[in-house]
């Protein structure tokens, strides 16, 4: 992303704008959470993140578009963390939450280490990340369908119950 003339990009300004997008993402979460549960709108977050990170691969040599893709990704990241925190609090019991998080931390660190040692080029890395984000969107959709089906079953069971009558 070197600007014309070979001068260095304004890294401080780029970082600042990315952090602003991340903060705006938390506001986006608040806006979305007022209308729908995180199970529903998180599917879109993953899809937008995949499209945003596909931008540098799809449009090589266009730094402005790459920056726009990264800013869109940071916006999604800002909405992702509160959405996943809400989902985790709904799904994972408090007593087991720390243990479960720690179980996933070790494999995650091993995966990061293997990726760093593999010396993949940028296009391969972005392509893999886009594929993983698309898979995350599909899995989030499966979670949403499962929770909607479960909610419908609970409502159906509760509506079939006869009211208690005092004798």
Model segments located where?
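Transmembrane alpha-helix termini and helix-breaking/packing motifs in multi-pass membrane transporters
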Residues: 1-6, 26-36, 54-58, 109-137
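Substrate-agnostic recognition of the 12-TM MFS/MFS-like secondary transporter fold
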Residues: 15-30, 45-46, 69-117
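C-terminal transmembrane helical hairpin of 12-TM major facilitator-type secondary transporters
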Residues: 39-81
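Juxtamembrane helix-start motifs in multi-pass secondary transporters
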Residues: 37-45, 100, 125
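Multi-pass alpha-helical transporter architecture, strongest
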Residues: 127-167
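Hydrophobic alpha-helical transmembrane segments
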Residues: 16-24, 44-52, 124-143
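Juxtamembrane helix-start elements in MFS-like secondary transporters
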Residues: 6-15, 62, 66, 101, ...
């Amino acid at each position: 992303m070197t600007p014309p003339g070979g001068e260095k990009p304004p890294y401080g300004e780029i970082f600042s704008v990315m952090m602003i997008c991340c903060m705006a993402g938390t506001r986006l979460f608040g806006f979305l959470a007022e209308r729908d549960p995180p199970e529903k709108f998180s599917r879109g977050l993953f899809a937008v993140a995949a499209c945003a990170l596909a931008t540098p691969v799809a449009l090589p040599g266009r730094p402005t578009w790459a920056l726009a893709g990264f800013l869109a990704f940071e916006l999604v990241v800002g909405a992702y963390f509160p959405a996943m925190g809400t989902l985790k609090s709904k799904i994972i019991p408090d007593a087991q939450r720390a243990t479960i998080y720690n179980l996933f931390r070790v494999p995650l660190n091993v995966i990061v280490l293997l990726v760093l040692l593999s010396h993949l080029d940028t296009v391969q890395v972005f392509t893999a990340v886009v594929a993983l984000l698309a898979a995350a969107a599909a899995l989030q959709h499966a979670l949403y369908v499962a929770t909607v089906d479960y909610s419908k079953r609970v409502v159906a069971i509760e509506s079939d119950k006869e009211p208690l009558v005092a004798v």
